[in-house]
Amino acid sequence: MTAARTRAATPEDVAEICLGLPEVELGTSWGDNPTYKVRGKGFVMHRPPGRTALDPATGEPFTDLLVIQVPDESDKQALVDDPTLPFFTIDHFHGYAAVLVQQSRLGEVSRDELAEILTDAWLTKAPPALRKAFLADG
């Protein structure tokens, strides 16, 4: 494995990883929020500041959040409950298979870990035939 793959993740890695997955484009959703989509279905969204996601240290809205789809509630809980990871959730996402992360904290995971999480997010939204072909090429 190269150093570029095992280094700390950066916000720029999000675009590189997402756009490196099959049939992904950067579009928008929920208005004009930049969203990585596979065949029109979003799997990573840049979330705008809002009153439902406040920084507990300042009481101010987070300004650099990503919403990342996860396969299911158990995957969500595993990411949120691991104290070594920067992922979290808010009441607004109760019952929804997604986690949030501040882009400024992406360096707390490796690029490889981020790639795995974003690939899993892509797999949640990719059509079955595309998933199958991707996994077969694995």
Segments predicted by a language model, with ranges:
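Charge-dense, helix-prone N-terminal extensions
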Residues: 1-138
